[in-house]
Amino acid sequence: FTKQICEKYKIPTASFGIFENKKDAKKFLKSTNYPTVIKADNLASGKGVYICTNENEAIIAIDEIFNGKFGEAKNLLIEEFLNGEEMSFFTIHDGITFKTFDTAQDHKRVLEGDRGKNTGGMGAYSPSRLINEDLKNKIINKIIKPTLEGLAGFGSKYKGFLYTGLMIVKNEPYLIEYNVRMGDPECQTILPKLKTDINEIFLACCEEELNNVNIEWTDKKSLCIVVCSKGYPEEFKKNIEI
């Protein structure tokens, strides 16, 4: 759905292919450059993304997704690997207007040195060190506003948080994903800096009065680290006493 909006409204994103079965997906690998990115097209708690450095890794990813590792998979996405740095850009919407809601960067790989499998996030900091006024304007004008135009075209009067997952390549933003919620662990670094009562913001969204709310922030940096069970994001023990 997101990629369809990107195509129609010319939102910058990685080139991609969508596949409904293993055979077609594996056939596509023959013409793929590596590394490549393979994504499960369903909810996977942030763990359904594979960065594959060769065809064998890509085949394993395709098999795991279509074999139901993240639930029933009707299709998957194979897309171009963008060599940049990820950033999370948050906005909040009342169906008429929107306001920016700070930025963050999370660290998705399970091991030190950006190694290992992707997770839901092993830690985050806010604001993103990448953000600047020029980049912020590009994100709003090239990605956020066209997306809202696209949603309106589908008859959606969107209200709530929009989490825009971006890859920043030489100060240019490319859309990786959207979530219609705040990110975690990103929210743990963003919300402590919020000075405005969040209930006031939510009420304004419900009543389409967001334009009348002044969202204020403390001028501080914030950082969080995730503690997880041994073995995560694969098989791991739950309900361990800390």
Regions found by a protein language model. Name each.
Residues 1-32, 36-37, 44:
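Conserved N-proximal alpha/beta basic substrate-recognition cap immediately N-terminal to
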